[in-house]
């Protein structure tokens, strides 16, 4: 029997983007779910109310993309979770960095009249 060489292509990894109303957290995992690297808008350098902006989400995504390219994680599946302002900006930051995006999923949970909502904020 022949010994076939394994392909030299980069392994597939998941980029999980969690956007909340206050922050954006991006977590890169392998196929088994083990965390390889992560970043948040706060860890990039945005503090306070600036973490919730779309520019902070884009900067966080660009930092994660640079680290992915450094580790040869080029082929990615993207998973979005949460309701925040930075979804499109984070996707734009990942696309412009040179990653090969294979699939995009949105896993945001939508309640069908589940738990009672928090009361509205009045200013």
Model-identified regions with their sequence ranges:
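Ribosome-associated RNA-binding proteins
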Residues: 1-123
């Amino acid at each position: 029997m022949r010994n076939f060489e394994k392909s030299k292509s980069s392994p597939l990894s998941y980029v999980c983007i969690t956007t909340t109303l206050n922050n954006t957290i991006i977590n890169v995992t392998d196929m088994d779910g083990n965390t390889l690297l992560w970043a948040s808008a706060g860890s990039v350098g945005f503090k306070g109310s600036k973490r919730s902006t779309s520019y902070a989400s884009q900067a966080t995504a660009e930092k994660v993309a640079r680290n992915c390219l450094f580790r040869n994680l080029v082929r990615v599946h993207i998973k979005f979770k949460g309701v925040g302002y930075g979804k499109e900006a984070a996707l734009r930051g990942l696309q412009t960095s040179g990653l090969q995006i294979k699939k995009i999923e949105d896993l945001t949970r939508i309640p069908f009249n589940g738990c009672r909502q928090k009361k509205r904020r009045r200013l």
